[in-house]
Amino acid sequence: MNREIDSAREQIDAAWLRSDADGITRHLAEDAVLLPPNGAKQVGREEINTWLRGLFQHYTMTELAMPERELTVSGDFAFERSLYEWLLVPNGEGEAIRDRANWVGIWRRAANGTWSEICGIWNSALPADVSQAKAETAEAAGSS
């Protein structure tokens, strides 16, 4: 493992639990890319910060665990693969979202030796709700 990246990951995870977009994005490169599931890519630290602030207006993460994590460093790049478990609770009406998610993060070491995350992507490790998908597909087919 890499102490600097490990420390940054701990700080990022703690920031998620505080709904702290700045605490998350301070560890990202200026040109970072975030690829959330079922949504548009977010490009650049500022755009990612805005996306996170929007998320935190609606949800608060109250549980976060990482039962699996692997980090491979190769030269000035590091590749992180993790399994996350989290609970997002709505700040108003609605249902909480519990998920297990596969995460891949790519880190880059700058000329001054500091590491920043340059790309992150995740997807749910839970099975898709096939009955809901079938109902939505049937509804869409009927409305064509």
Regions found by a protein language model. Name each.
Residues 1-26, 33-144:
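A beta-strand edge to alpha-helix "cap/lid" segment located at domain peripheries
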